[in-house]
């Protein structure tokens, strides 16, 4: 199938069954911290509740990160040599796992929280899911100016730290000094 060609993993029809994914305890699944369910995510599982008429199952790959409740592989990882293939068979992949996969791929990680973060074209914005201290790690020393609530002063730094209220959005202009 086109999906198999794209991801380099053999998929198989899994028939009717649960879409909830139970994580296996693989190190890539570490760092999930939900005190209460968020969009169906808890620290050990994610995905939709209930049964669905058709599912695709991942292979018994090099690494099975998660399984459907009936034991069928649902989140798999395979080293393809120059790249890594990941198959996720259920919606709602937790941000912590996505962040760990990005880290594995060598991507810069701006924040280790599950807040929404947007970066591009000279702007970085963080929308806080929860209240508390926040930190944005920049890829290098950059000139930073807060756009909405700041005093307009610029500073050069490789880390932006601030306290945020739940659901507060902070927007920063960044540029090479």
Give the residues covered by each predicted segment.
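A conserved amphipathic helix/loop scaffold
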Residues: 1-177
